[in-house]
Amino acid sequence: MTNSLFLLAEGGLFDFNATLPLMVLQILLLMVVLNAIFYTPIARVLDERDEYIRKNLTQASETLAKAEAITKQYEQDLAKERRDAQMIIASSQQEAQEIVAMEIKQAQKDTELLVNEATTQLNSQKEKALQALEKQVNTLSEQIKNKLLSGQLAG
């Protein structure tokens, strides 16, 4: 019966002998070696990469914030310049309308003066013509009167 128990223990799941602690030592030694050779450099590279990415993300965020601030400032400046340009255009149009109105008034005054001068000249020429006609009428009347009187005296 002791033989049968011993046989059962040998063929069991675990054999409790000197190989089990050796296996544990091999696994621990493998973990230490892998940690020193493989995991530590990989962890360092991953940490460096993580730091690099974090640093670049921070710089990108700062650059993006600056770009947005500059864009906003440019948009504000552009809007202000557009308003100023529209005000300048409106004032220029107003000035142009005032200048045109003044020139139209001046042209109307000049036209009135020309019409008045022409009317005055025409009236003056009319008066001269009437005076000349009146002299001719008077002269002709005198001649007719003289002929009539001389015809009556002769006849």
Swiss-Prot record:
InterPro entries in alphabetical order: ATP_synth_b, ATP_synth_b/b'su_bac/chlpt, ATP_synthase_B_chain
GO MF, one example: proton-transporting ATPase activity, rotational mechanism
This protein's record includes keyword Transmembrane: yes
Localisation per UniProt entry: Plastid, Chloroplast thylakoid membrane
Major localization listed first in the record, in broad terms: plastid
Record CDD domains: ATP-synt_Fo_b
Transmembrane segments: 18-38
A GO term from the CC aspect: proton-transporting ATP synthase complex
Pfam family, one: ATP-synt_B
Keywords associated with the record: ATP synthesis, CF(0), Chloroplast, Hydrogen ion transport, Ion transport, Membrane, Plastid, Thylakoid, Transmembrane, Transmembrane helix, Transport
Topology of this chain in the membrane: Single-pass membrane protein
Keyword Nucleus tagged: no
Biological function: F(1)F(0) ATP synthase produces ATP from ADP in the presence of a proton or sodium gradient. F-type ATPases consist of two structural domains, F(1) containing the extramembraneous catalytic core and F(0) containing the membrane proton channel, linked together by a central stalk and a peripheral stalk. During catalysis, ATP synthesis in the catalytic domain of F(1) is coupled via a rotary mechanism of the central stalk subunits to proton translocation.
PANTHER family named in the record: ATP SYNTHASE SUBUNIT B', CHLOROPLASTIC
Miscellaneous comment text of the record: In plastids the F-type ATPase is also known as CF(1)CF(0).
Family per record: Belongs to the ATPase B chain family.
Subunit structure of this chain's protein: F-type ATPases have 2 components, F(1) - the catalytic core - and F(0) - the membrane proton channel. F(1) has five subunits: alpha(3), beta(3), gamma(1), delta(1), epsilon(1). F(0) has four main subunits: a(1), b(1), b'(1) and c(10-14). The alpha and beta chains form an alternating ring which encloses part of the gamma chain. F(1) is attached to F(0) by a central stalk formed by the gamma and epsilon chains, while a peripheral stalk is formed by the delta, b and b' chains.
HAMAP family: ATP_synth_b_bprime, ATP_synth_bprime
Identification of the protein by name: ATP synthase subunit b', chloroplastic
Species, as recorded: Rhodomonas salina
Protein encoded by which gene: atpF2
